[in-house]
Amino acid sequence: MKKSNLKIFILAGGLGTRLKSIISDVPKPMAPILNKPFISYVINNIREYYQDEIYLLTHHKSNIIEEYFKSDSKIIIIKENNPLDTGGAVRNAILELNLSVETKILVINGDTYIKPDLNQFIASSDGQINIITKKISDCSRYNTLSIRENRIEKFNDKKESSRNMHVNLGYYLFNDLYFFKDIIDDKFSLED
């Protein structure tokens, strides 16, 4: 994977409201799976392709994530003071790192595990913004995407979703940062 201008951000700041009754003492990305935090599996998958720094964008119970990864010099924590949603968290990290608009970023949901071929995804992603999706038959539990000719036309709420639609698998590649250049809202979602 060509790394010269690539940064990897993992979204790890959510409240985990649906899992609160099961794992109230840790943030959702730190949910234990076979005695390891879930997010460590995501990071290990990335490290098969990428050896540079990985930025964890945190908020809720950030101290637990910071403590776990404190001895890993390649994990950098960027903490939101207030919850900023997915897009706001990314924008906050871009500003904090003072990234140029030519920088390429891969944003990954810290609570989603898939094993894509990241080299192939990056090499084949020619749009400004690229998202890994999957077409599924039962979309009742998911927000979906309306796609035509490999272009996203719309993000759909669960209420608008029907059968056999694409769902977002939580991997976003921004080939440059022009998308974020003129956004002035601190808090916004990547899916809006």
Model regions: which residues?
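Catalytic-core segments of class I nucleotidyltransferases/pyrophosphorylases
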Residues: 106, 113, 119-123, 137, ...
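Short beta-strand-to-loop element that shapes/binds the nucleotide-sugar donor at the catalytic cleft/hinge
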Residues: 60, 130-148
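Conserved donor NDP-sugar-binding/catalytic core segment of glycosyltransferases
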Residues: 124-129
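Short, charged, surface-exposed secondary-structure boundary motifs
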Residues: 86-89, 138-143, 163-166
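Conserved N-terminal catalytic core of the sugar/cofactor nucleotidyltransferase
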Residues: 1-10, 18, 32, 36-109, ...
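Short alpha-helical oligomerization interface
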Residues: 24-29
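Active-site glycine-centered loops adjacent to acidic/histidine catalytic or metal-binding residues
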Residues: 14, 111, 135
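Short, well-ordered beta-strand micro-motif
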Residues: 32, 146, 173-175
